Swiss-Prot record:
Active site residues according to the UniProt entry: D101 (proton donor/acceptor)
Entry protein name: Lactamase-like protein nscB
Organism: Neosartorya fischeri (strain ATCC 1020 / DSM 3700 / CBS 544.65 / FGSC A1164 / JCM 1740 / NRRL 181 / WB 181) (Aspergillus fischerianus)
Top-rank taxon: Eukaryota
Pathway annotation: Secondary metabolite biosynthesis
Keywords attached to this entry: Hydrolase, Metal-binding, Zinc
Residues binding Zn(2+) 1: H97, H99
Family matches, as InterPro entries: LACTB2-like_MBL-fold, Metallo-B-lactamas, RibonucZ/Hydroxyglut_hydro, Sec-metab_biosynth-thioest, WH-like_DNA-bd_sf
Task performed by this protein: Lactamase-like protein; part of the gene cluster that mediates the biosynthesis of neosartoricin, a prenylated anthracenone that exhibits T-cell antiproliferative activity, suggestive of a physiological role as an immunosuppressive agent. The non-reducing polyketide synthase nscA probably synthesizes and cyclizes the decaketide backbone. The hydrolase nscB then mediates the product release through hydrolysis followed by spontaneous decarboxylation. The prenyltransferase nscD catalyzes the addition of the dimethylallyl group to the aromatic C5.
Recorded family membership: Belongs to the metallo-beta-lactamase superfamily.
Length: 328
């Protein structure tokens, strides 16, 4: 018998934002502009949307490839078909980050053309790969691509700025649909601000459709994360205020909530397994960021039972008055 749980709608909008069954269909291969061809990785799914986007960039006979998909045979067949039909070759392979749905096709490409093994670039490179430095330029006919270090989603994450189009290949930092995840939320939010400061108009994400208004999308991402973090802090502040007693307890570690208690305070009645599998990652990211910002503390001990609490603000003393005091 199915069990009906009174889930809060706000949670499901968050959890399902990138897994909507109504995602627009994307062609296996698409010419997006005179400089950019997109080839889907053939790996659609809840975590990959329509699949990993890989891009051939440039206008001449030699093109830059950004990301390589998950390593499925269908992707190799697709990209080889594009290369042959356009009579073009690959000059550089640029990897946005280390995740397997972006790097998995590298061995297949090298098997197809062994000379490509000398032209694979990634920040914090694996064996046989070459490093990418922040600001490094990769150029082919019709395309100047600048690497931009944007960690947070991963420690090595790079975006790539296509100067001729004022466009940004956003990797997994910003998706065409829904929201991304970030193990290091603090650095991720810094990266979003950095990306916004680049002033790019167009976004080519690693998953999902082209982002036609990148500034608005970045503003949405930044606002979304800030609201979620502030929501967690508000829950902990209310809990502290609830349990604080008389003046003698001010400044002490009063109250405190476990991860599950925080989740239920924000989203209502949610089963433990849903919290652990779907909600805990972001909650932990936000709590650690708030800890780094010295707005939240925690009690040491078992991580599952650990209590998190809002740090009390120190009251500032009024400035001391100098000079004579009038007497009655």
């Amino acid at each position: 018998m199915a069990l009906r749980m009174p889930f809060n709608q706000a949670f499901w909008e968050e959890y399902l934002s990138g897994q909507d069954a109504t995602l627009p269909s994307l062609p296996d291969t698409s010419t997006l502009s005179s400089r950019v061809i997109r080839i889907l990785g053939g790996n659609p799914g809840a975590m990959h949307l329509q699949g990993t986007n890989t891009y051939l960039v440039g206008t001449g006979p030699s093109r830059i490839l950004i990301d390589t998909g998950q390593g499925l045979p269908i992707w190799l067949s697709r990209i080889v078909g594009v290369l042959h039909s356009n009579n073009i070759s690959i000059s550089h392979i640029l990897l946005t980050h280390w995740h397997g749905d972006h790097t998995g096709g590298v061995p297949d490409l090298i098997s197809y053309n062994p000379t490509l093994g000398e032209h694979v670039y990634k920040n914090l490179p694996d064996a046989g790969q070459k490093p990418i430095e922040d600001g490094q330029i990769f150029a082919v006919e019709g395309a100047t691509v600048r690497a931009v270090f944007t960690p947070g989603h991963s420690v090595d994450h790079m975006c790539f700025l296509l100067e001729e189009e004022n466009a940004l290949f956003t990797g997994d930092n910003v998706l065409g649909h829904g929201f991304s995840v970030a193990p290091d939320l603090g650095r991720y939010m810094e990266s979003l601000e950095l990306m916004a400061g680049l002033g790019c108009v167009l976004g080519y994400p690693a998953h999902g459709a082209v982002i036609g208004d990148l500034p608005s999308k970045l503003e949405e991402y930044i606002r979304h994360k800030e609201m979620r973090v502030q929501g967690i802090l508000s829950v902990l502040v209310k809990e502290r205020e609830r349990v604080e007693g008389d003046r003698g307890t001010e400044g002490r570690r009063k109250g405190g909530m476990t991860l599950h208690e925080i989740a239920r305070a924000m989203f209502g009645t949610v089963p433990d397994e849903v919290i652990d599998q779907a909600m805990a990652p972001f909650l932990m990211q936000a709590l650690w960021k708030l800890t780094e910002d010295r707005k939240v503390g925690f009690e040491p001990g078992d991580p599952v039972k650990r209590k998190w609490f809002a740090v009390a603000r120190r009251k500032t003393k009024p400035p001391r008055q100098h000079g004579s005091v009038a007497r009655q």
